């Protein structure tokens, strides 16, 4: 089986005045179809730089990045934008929803740039994506009419709507309390059971226990790449939490 993405000896350097910052120092790993991988690291570890490269928002200084069989490291900006819109689904910590746009319209957004998808098909796929995250009853609500957890569900639906080869999640539980975080991880685990490939960036060790594999970055180097032998079930973890009225975050 070929990997969905392959990172080979990736380096990323930034010029800061007279100094050069080595954000990534020769990192290599593969992610295969159907994997749920956590990329962990503290501030300064290089995980945000890595996510920018994985998301085709930045290019490495050297090394190879192959996504779905295609080399990306030498592509021009327009070609990278096309890859982002067709092959990648993004979920951000701050949701990044348009405030004056309904949930379903937010979910439809990635398909607006795909001329091969009709308005009717775009609407149908957005409804299906919202159903997958349990928000079909809120599709006409504006973001300010939704809770933080519901807004993140809309963001996940938006990431699903173009049927990406991989979902890239950046601290997707970072703005949520523990109960809501576990609810969101339940969705990611269910999507993974359905065959979705997920790369989830986090600095929270407890969130990493819900994935099947953890890659740890430190000082721009890959320090660990381990298979999680005891994957925690997010639904069971959620049900084990104290009731909301007794819950002390």
Predicted regions, residues:
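ABC family nucleotide-binding domain
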Residues: 2-217
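Conserved beta-strand-loop-alpha-helix hinge in the C-terminal portion
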Residues: 221-246
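Short, Lys/Arg-enriched, disordered terminal segments
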Residues: 1-3, 247-248
């Amino acid at each position: 089986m070929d990997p969905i993405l392959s990172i080979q000896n990736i380096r990323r350097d930034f010029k800061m005045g007279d100094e050069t910052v080595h954000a990534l120092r020769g990192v290599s790993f593969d992610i295969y179809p159907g994997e749920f991988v956590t990329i962990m690291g503290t501030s300064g570890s290089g995980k945000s730089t890595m996510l920018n490269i994985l998301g085709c928002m930045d290019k490495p200084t050297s090394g190879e990045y192959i996504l779905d069989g295609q080399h990306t490291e030498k592509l021009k900006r327009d070609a990278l934008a096309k890859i982002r819109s067709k092959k990648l689904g993004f979920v951000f910590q701050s949701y990044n929803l348009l405030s004056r746009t309904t949930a379903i319209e937010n979910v439809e957004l990635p398909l607006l740039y795909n001329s091969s998808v009709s308005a009717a098909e775009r609407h149908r796929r957005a409804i299906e994506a919202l159903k997958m995250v349990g928000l079909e009853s809120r599709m006409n609500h504006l973001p300010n009419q939704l809770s933080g957890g519901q807004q993140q569900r809309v963001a996940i639906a938006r990431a699903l709507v173009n049927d990406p080869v991989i979902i890239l999640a950046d601290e997707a539980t970072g703005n949520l309390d523990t109960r809501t975080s576990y609810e969101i991880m339940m969705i990611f685990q269910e999507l993974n059971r359905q065959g979705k490939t997920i790369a989830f960036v986090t600095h929270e060790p407890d969130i990493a226990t819900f994935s099947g594999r953890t890659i740890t970055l430190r000082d721009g180097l890959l320090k660990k790449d381990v298979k999680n032998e005891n994957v925690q079930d997010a639904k069971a973890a959620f049900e084990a939490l104290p009731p909301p009225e007794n819950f002390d975050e």
